[in-house]
Amino acid sequence: MYNTYAIIVHVSKLRNSHLFANASAIPNLQAVIRKKLLDSMKSRQKDVASTLKVFLSEIEYANKSSKPVTTDLDVLRVLKKNIKKRKQAIEQFRKAERLDLAEKEESQIQTLRQFLPEHASNI
């Protein structure tokens, strides 16, 4: 029915991709976000998957800076920074009367807020 070789090659490419490499060497929160990304891709939630892909790429970018992301606190730092940036974008979109883009940013913030601890979710 399925070409077994093609499936093995596909799975090995997934393991070697930058999103899923070194799963044991990453913080727990980052692993949870990657799991959520996989789930959203499987259930075809394009908006959620897109938001999480962008966030994971920002973590990768932060890893290449002077402050690499090595703990959950570092992931939270990047997450809070990302949410703050999106809030500023919402303000700019509302000033420009682009309510459609503001709503899109708000939904992306809601996607990211689910990874904040309860006491920090009011950010």
Curated annotation (Swiss-Prot):
GO biological process, one term: mitochondrial tRNA modification
InterPro entries: Asn/Gln_tRNA_amidoTrase-B-like (IPR003789), YqeY/Aim41 (IPR019004), YqeY/Aim41_N (IPR042184)
Gene3D superfamilies, per the entry: Uncharacterised protein YqeY/AIM41 PF09424, N-terminal domain
Domain of life: Eukaryota
GO CC terms in record: mitochondrial matrix
SUPFAM superfamilies given in the database record: GatB/YqeY motif
GO-annotated molecular function: carbon-nitrogen ligase activity, with glutamine as amido-N-donor
Matching Pfam families: YqeY (PF09424)
Name of the protein: Uncharacterized protein C22F3.15
Organism of derivation: Schizosaccharomyces pombe (strain 972 / ATCC 24843)
